[in-house]
Amino acid sequence: LQQYNLASNIKGIRYAGNVGDPVFAAADGQVVYAADGLKEYGNLVLVKHINGYITAYAHNSKLNVKSGQNVTAGQKIAEMGSSGTTRTMLEFQVRLDGKPVNPASVLPNS
C-alpha cells in the first residue's frame, strides 16, 4: 500500500488487507501496549524486543494479546481493521530508541 517515507509522515509500512486478516508478531518479545489510547493509530499493539527495538502494529479491528504478555515470532497478535483510519490496513512500524527505522532495513528478505 505505502512504503516508509518520513517526508510524507509515513513512519512504517502500510499493508492493505481485509478486516479480520491475521496480524503476526515479527519477532519474539513482550507486549508493552495493547489498547486504543492513541487515536491516530486506532487499536495498537506495541512489542518490545530484547535488542532494543519496538515494533508497532496499528489500525487493528481486534487485539489478541494484552500488555505484559510474551509473544513469539509468527504468533497471531491481532486482526487487521480500519480503526483510526479510513481504510483497512496494517501500519507496521519499527522503532529504536524511540525513533522510526525503515522496517525494510531490519527485517529479513522474504
Residue ranges and their predicted role:
Residues 3-6, 43-55:
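Short, basic/aromatic beta-hairpin or loop at an interaction surface
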Residues 12-16, 44-49, 91-93:
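Short, acidic/hydrophobic/Gly-rich beta-strand patch recurrent on exposed beta strands
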Residues 3, 34-35, 63, 80-83:
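Residue-level recognition of beta-strand microenvironments
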Residues 22-31, 65-79:
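Short, well-structured beta-strand-loop connectors
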Residues 19-21, 51-54, 99:
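Short acidic/polar mixed-charge low-complexity motifs
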Residues 1-41:
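Surface-exposed, glycine-biased beta-strand/turn segments
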Residues 34, 50-74:
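Short histidine-centered loop motifs in beta-beta connectors
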Residues 69-110:
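Conserved, short, structured surface segments that act as functional micro-motifs
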